[in-house]
Every structure is written in C-alpha cells, then in structure tokens.
Amino acid sequence: NSIVKSGAFQKMEKQKSDINFFASMTAIPSTYRDQITMGLPTEVKAEDITLIGGLNFEKGKIALKTENYTENEAVKALLKKQMESVGKANNTFVKYFPASTLMFFNVGVKGGELYNLLSENKEFRNTVSIAKADEVKELFSSFNGDISAGLINVTMSSAPTFMMYADVKNGNALEMIYKNKESLGLKRGEDIMQLGKDEYVYKTRGMNIFFGIKDKQMYATNDELLYKNVGKAADKSVKDAPYASDMKGKSLFIAINAEAILDLPIVKMVAGFGGQEAKTYIEPVSYTHL
C-alpha cells in the first residue's frame, strides 16, 4: 500500500502549516512518546498511533502543533478517554512562579476520570494493591483543576529547587498519607512529619519536601523559603513571561526558559570550561514551549 493513500498522510496534506509532517509513534523520542501514551493500556502498541504535526515560522518564534491519529477503533476510544481526563487549564497558579522559572509545566486535570483511565492499565493495576486501591482513588479524585510545576533553580551545592501547586477538593488524601506512613515503606532516615494543620514535611537525609493544603490548593516544594511564601504572588511571574499568552486555552503546556538557563552561574561556569560552542547555538533562543 502506498503511504500517500493512508489516512494519516491525507490528513497531514490538508494542514496549512509552513512545514507539515507525520511520524509513527515508534520513530519519536521515548520521553515524548511516554507523555502521549500516558495511562493507556500496555496492549496499545506505538505503531497504532501516528503523530501528525505542523511547524510555523512566526514573528520572533517557531510554533509547533501536533495531534494523534489512529484508524484503530479501540485506540480511538482510549485516546478519547485520555482527552476526557484533562480539561483546559485555568492558569490559576502562574502568578506564584517567578518569570525566571527554568522549566514550567501546566495541565488541567479531572482526577476521577484520570484514575478510571489508569485503572484500565494492567501495569497500574498490578502496582496498586487491592488494599491500597481506595487510598489511591481518593488521592487521584482529590485533584480537580490545574496542576502546575516549575524548576526554579539549579546549583552545584544542592538538589534542583522545584515548586508545585494543584487545585484539590480537600486535604483528605494528604491526611490519609500521613496517617498511613508506616505502610509506605519509608527507608532508614526518611520520615513524614506534621508541621501544622494540613502542613507536612517529607524528610530525607539529602532533602526536605514541604507539602500541604492552603485555601484548597495543594503545594509541594523542597525549598524552605518558597514554603514560607506559599500562596504569595511573585513580583514578576510567569504571568508576565513572553510565552504567557500561548498558554491560553491549552490543556497541557510546557515551557523552557533558555535565557534564564544560560544565566545560571553553573551554566556560565560550564561554558568557561569548553561549553561555549553549545552556549553560542542556544543563545539566540529565548524560550521554547510545547
């Protein structure tokens, strides 16, 4: 059969992008493939899905748009369920992340639908024991809205700094995790401690992760200063970033701030030790997003 007669090729031809392309899911990098097939049963094969995309050269930026295509009816039904587990993000938490955030992730989630989708995945069912099923369902179902996460800083002296916020219905899931910490299989030197109402810290030998609920918003961070300022807007936030307008109406959005990354002391040091050529190639790029 000629490739030009395939449904994927014909759909690609109808696009009005500067560059149109399509590729079998088996041919794209595993990190992107795993993101697309998240939660789908293991019996769904990569070759059942084709990635159709378009590249547009716009003023000051290069825009990439992609979608999944399949002629397998069973896979179509599963992809539909996958789409139903996410909704358009409201960008609720962008004001809490500084504009200098190195990598920003934002997704709109319907927790109950996501749990139902994952329940059809054999690996997920095998991982979650019957005894823990209700607790896991409670945790997933508590998510209802935006989940935003950001890589804030990277240094040589400590673990990369991150921050995460999520819309939740209540704090029941976190309270359940704390009360059942003995069954979590914590290793020596690890513990979960309660700092106050709906405030906890997961302590390890190398890092502390502060997490909790504030105003029906779940948070988690490994930086004590960020923890103490939870719920406070940044002076100049992601809301003011050049890519902020591109987030509107998206269910999933990922941005990488190349300017901020190149400005890191650790990157400047690496450039001084022979990484200048790579820096020269990256420097013209301000940011990239998916």
Residue ranges of model-derived segments:
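Short amphipathic alpha-helical linker/capping segments at the junctions of internal repeats
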Residues: 2-13, 81-96, 124-126, 185-186, ...
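Single conserved position on a long alpha-helix in the C-terminal lobe of the eukaryotic protein kinase
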Residues: 1-6, 145-243
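Intrinsically disordered, low-complexity segments enriched in small/polar residues
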Residues: 37, 51-52, 58-61, 143, ...
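A short, polar/proline- and glycine-enriched secondary-structure boundary/capping micro-motif
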Residues: 74-79, 116, 175-176, 230-233
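Short, solvent-exposed secondary-structure boundary motifs
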Residues: 36-47, 81-85, 131-145, 181-188, ...
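Long, low-complexity, Ser/Thr/Gly/Pro-rich intrinsically disordered segments that act as flexible linkers
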Residues: 7-29, 57, 93-96, 100-111, ...
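Leucine-rich, highly hydrophobic segment in Treponema pallidum outer-membrane-associated proteins
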Residues: 7-103, 256-290
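Generic detector of short, locally flexible boundary/turn motifs and exposed helical patches
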Residues: 29-34, 67-72, 125-132, 182-188
